[in-house]
């Protein structure tokens, strides 16, 4: 249960309003994005699965067992469609409630992240500018050496490598220096962000407008209700699978009986 609640919390704490999965203009809710991705995946699985089932049924073994897998597969597909129709509204309600209850927390964290981004952006821009300047200087130094390689013979290759190696080492040292500088400059902001997030979570833990304990209790309650509503639908799935299993079992037993008769004849 904790893993489920933590996963849902991570999803909603991002607070992103990405574009629609199919690039429509209006942003989707978290539930709509998950539902669309799941539908695309399930449709692909259904199509590929039906193709494999059809191939198995058309094989010599399938004909001998008289499995009728395609009919059973279609029946199973209808059963899963009923599952989707029954559980879809319940799951959507759960997502919407959790998203609403974490809205304030996500807003505050996004605000803190944006503040840190604005403060650190000048450092990042400066590092990028210096890095590009070093790359350009490196290119200008290496270009004449590359021309020498094209114009010279193979015996100059070792000499060229000796000339290029120090330049590569200089570039590597520059990158390390920039990384160390950037790490030093960003360290205070990283510590500040860590403390801010810790304070946010501690305030919620101590019993703010919406505590983590309340989120856990509400999520547990919603998941329990979802489980109760899913029981009859899961029973339908079980009933849908039984004909396929019985058909397969009967076919296998018939093949065994025929083989036994041939051996004793």
Curated annotation (Swiss-Prot):
Keywords linked to the UniProt accession: Cholesterol metabolism, Glycoprotein, HDL, Lipid metabolism, Lipid transport, Lipoprotein, Oxidation, Palmitate, Phosphoprotein, Repeat, Secreted, Signal, Steroid metabolism, Sterol metabolism, Transport
GO cellular component: chylomicron; extracellular vesicle; high-density lipoprotein particle; low-density lipoprotein particle; very-low-density lipoprotein particle
Database matches in InterPro entries: ApoA_E (IPR000074), Apolipoprotein_A1/A4/E (IPR050163)
Region (10 X approximate tandem repeats): 67-265
Modification(s) after translation: Glycosylated. Palmitoylated.
Molecular function terms, GO-annotated: cholesterol transfer activity; phosphatidylcholine-sterol O-acyltransferase activator activity; phospholipid binding; protein homodimerization activity
Gene3D superfamilies: 1.20.5.20, 6.10.140.380, Apolipoprotein
Methionine sulfoxide PTM positions: 193, 242, 244
A Pfam cross-reference name: Apolipoprotein
Tissues in which the UniProt entry reports expression: Major protein of plasma HDL, also found in chylomicrons.
Compartments, as annotated in UniProt: Secreted
GO process terms (BP): acylglycerol homeostasis; cholesterol efflux; cholesterol metabolic process; lipoprotein metabolic process; phospholipid efflux; positive regulation of cholesterol efflux; positive regulation of phagocytosis; positive regulation of phospholipid efflux
Each Sequence repeat, start to end: 67-88, 89-110, 111-121, 122-143, 144-165, 166-187, 188-209, 210-231, 232-242, 243-265
Signal peptide (UniProt feature, chain positions): 1-18
PANTHER family in UniProt: APOLIPOPROTEIN, APOLIPOPROTEIN A-I
Annotated family: Belongs to the apolipoprotein A1/A4/E family.
Function description: Participates in the reverse transport of cholesterol from tissues to the liver for excretion by promoting cholesterol efflux from tissues and by acting as a cofactor for the lecithin cholesterol acyltransferase (LCAT). As part of the SPAP complex, activates spermatozoa motility.
Subunit details: Homodimer. Interacts with APOA1BP and CLU. Component of a sperm activating protein complex (SPAP), consisting of APOA1, an immunoglobulin heavy chain, an immunoglobulin light chain and albumin. Interacts with NDRG1. Interacts with SCGB3A2. Interacts with NAXE and YJEFN3.
UniProt name for this protein: Apolipoprotein A-I
Source organism of the structure: Tupaia belangeri
Gene name in the database record: APOA1
């Amino acid at each position: 249960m904790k893993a489920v609640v933590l996963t849902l919390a991570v999803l909603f704490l991002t607070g992103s309003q990405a574009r629609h999965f199919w690039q429509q203009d209006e942003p989707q809710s978290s539930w709509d994005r998950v539902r669309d991705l799941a539908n695309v995946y399930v449709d692909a699985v259904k199509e590929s699965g039906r193709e494999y089932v059809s191939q198995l049924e058309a094989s010599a073994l399938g004909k001998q067992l008289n499995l009728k897998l395609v009919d059973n597969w279609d029946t199973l597909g209808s059963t899963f469609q009923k599952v989707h129709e029954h559980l879809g509204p319940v799951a959507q309600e759960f997502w919407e409630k959790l998203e609403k209850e974490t809205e304030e927390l996500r807003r505050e964290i996004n605000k803190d992240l944006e503040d840190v981004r604005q403060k650190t952006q000048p450092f990042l821009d400066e590092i990028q500018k210096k890095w590009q300047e070093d790359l350009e200087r490196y290119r200008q130094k290496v270009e004449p050496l590359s021309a020498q390689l094209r114009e010279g013979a193979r015996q100059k290759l070792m000499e060229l490598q000796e000339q290029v190696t120090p330049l590569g080492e200089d570039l590597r040292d520059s990158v390390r220096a920039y990384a160390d500088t950037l790490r030093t400059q960003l360290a205070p902001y990283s510590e500040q962000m860590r403390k801010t997030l810790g304070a946010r979570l501690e305030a919620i833990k101590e019993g703010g407008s919406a505590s983590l304990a309340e989120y856990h209790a509400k999520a547990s309650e919603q998941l329990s209700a979802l489980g109760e509503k899913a029981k009859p639908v899961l029973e339908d799935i079980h009933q849908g699978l039984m004909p396929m299993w019985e058909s397969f079992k009967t076919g296998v037993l018939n093949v065994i009986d025929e083989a036994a008769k041939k051996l004793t004849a």
